[in-house]
Regions:
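A short glycine-rich, Lys/Arg-flanked "PGG" loop and its adjoining helix->strand segment in the class I
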Residues: 112-124
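Short catalytic micro-motifs in class I SAM-dependent methyltransferases
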Residues: 101-104
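A conserved beta-strand element that flanks and buttresses the S-adenosyl-L-methionine
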Residues: 98
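Class I SAM-dependent methyltransferase SAM/SAH-binding core
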Residues: 29, 35, 39-87
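Short conserved loop adjoining the S-adenosyl-L-methionine
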Residues: 88-92
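Conserved beta-strand signature within the Rossmann-like core of class I S-adenosyl-L-methionine
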Residues: 125-133
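Conserved alpha-helix/loop element of class I SAM-dependent methyltransferases that forms part
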Residues: 6-24
Length: 178
């Protein structure tokens, strides 16, 4: 993905981690599945036919596009997609759960509750794969990181207008923590 540094490393690592932690007869969840990159990585990391893979996103458009990408994939493990708020998703018997740049869109006061629910639903030996943007306490460090991130986007083909529009669109929605 051209807007997130390290994303091209994160997705293959989700597959590797899923290979190590997916358990027979369990559920694997991709919470905030978007277009399905993490979902597909998890799918390829699951070696048990008895696993259920569930992708959840609150955007119908994202779910539709995710369905398209899943249909193009040649892996045989079925994927169940749900269009719902991840805070309302029923979780149980999980061996692998992924929050890939998703938690930052959950209101800060509701994050602990969601993480607790995930922990309670996770089987012994299971794992939560969490990828997030962070913010720095130092204003100077945060400003430097923001400049570097914008330069990364420019280097990957984004115009200044696109960068500005994206920043405006997510300013009050994406709330990273340290």
């Amino acid at each position: 993905m051209r807007r997130l540094p390290g994303y091209t490393t994160i997705i293959p690592m989700i597959e590797v981690i899923t290979e190590q932690y997916a358990q027979a007869g369990s559920n694997c969840y991709d919470l905030g599945c978007s277009l399905g990159a993490s979902t597909l990585a998890m799918r390829h990391g699951i070696s048990f036919d008895s696993c259920s893979l569930v992708g959840v996103d609150n955007s119908e458009a994202m779910i539709e596009r995710c369905e398209h990408y899943i249909a193009l994939d040649d892996h045989s493990l079925p994927v169940s997609l749900r269009c719902e708020n991840i805070q309302d998703t029923e979780l149980a018997n999980a061996s692998v759960t992924t929050l890939n740049f998703t938690l930052q869109f959950v209101p800060p006061e509701q994050r602990c509750s969601l993480l607790s629910r995930i922990a309670e639903a996770t089987r012994p030996g299971g794992v939560l794969i969490l990828s997030e943007k962070i913010r720095f306490d130092s204003e100077d460090e945060q400003a430097a990181q923001t400049r570097l991130h914008h330069e990364f986007k420019r280097a990957n083909g984004y115009s200044d207008l696109e960068i500005s529009q994206k920043r405006s669109a997510i300013e009050q929605v994406l709330i990273p923590e340290t």
